[in-house]
Amino acid sequence: MKTKTPALLATTALLALSPLASAGENHDHDHGHDHGSKIEIVAPEKLSDLWKSLEAEHDKLSAAIEKKDIPAAHDAEQRLQAYLKAIPAKTAALEDSTRARIDGQAKNLARAYDGVHHASDDKAWDKATSSLKKAEGGMKLLAAQIEKL
């Protein structure tokens, strides 16, 4: 009987712990959705056109936050993130210092929009609004860099 006990304990432990092994996969942060992006965009070829897309999505996000529309805010933020991730491919041919400034500002802006996203998911509308104002400041900085080109 003693030889079966370790095997029985190991099997019991494996069965008890196996749900924990996948607990972190596609988790929803208690917001009712997972944070894997399901939004697909086609990034414009030119950086100036990409900037116009960013501005349009920012306006959609602002309107969604004002209306307290979580699904619209989520979708706009996801599209903003996708456009921001497309920037490095558009800046690859630029001078190193210019590329570094634009790409760095895009990363900072992505973090700011992520703050808006999480605040709106939590229905913390004051925080979402203040995070959106930070993002607007980042948009102005990025616009200034792009306008120099």
Give residue ranges: language-model regions:
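C-terminal amphipathic alpha-helix
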Residues: 37-48, 59-60, 112-149
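Short, charged, amphipathic alpha-helical segments
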Residues: 73-78, 99-107, 126-137
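Short, solvent-exposed, charged loop/turn and helix-capping segments
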Residues: 83-103
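Immediate post-signal-peptide N-terminus of mature secreted/exported proteins
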Residues: 24-76, 148-149
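Amphipathic, well-ordered alpha-helical segments in soluble domains
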Residues: 50-53, 57, 79, 83-86, ...
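Bacterial N-terminal signal peptides that target proteins for export
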Residues: 1-13
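Alpha-helical coiled-coil oligomerization motifs
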Residues: 66, 92-95, 99, 121, ...
